[in-house]
Amino acid sequence: MAMTKHRKRDKQTVWLGDAEFDAELLPALTYFKRAGIQTEFSCAGVSLLDEPENHSLYAYITFITSKKTESFIEYSMERMRHRLLVTYEPSRKRYDPSSFFIGHNRRFCTLMNQYAQGFYLSQC
């Protein structure tokens, strides 16, 4: 017998400029913008408890390659260690850091917000 999945809350999105983003990554995206780090896509993912029908298995942010981006990627890899998976697409010149463990979307967002702020403040 299949279990009925009940929605706990809708996915929350906000507008930043002319693009819509997951609300849980807004602090990080704001710090990246202030630091001059260009992002292209992001997904906070949501848990099965929040959105049983339309959830993402992992959270990610796509960064356009630059010196600042590379510095942040290195900074976050040193701190997040095994919690972070980073892929690089040479043909598109972009990095895709994501949550390494399925189901750890909120922790990824919390850490990304924390390290985006720390990186930004270290650059000031």
What are these regions (language model features)?
Residues M1-C124:
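Structured alpha/beta or helical-core interaction and ligand-binding surfaces enriched in interleaved
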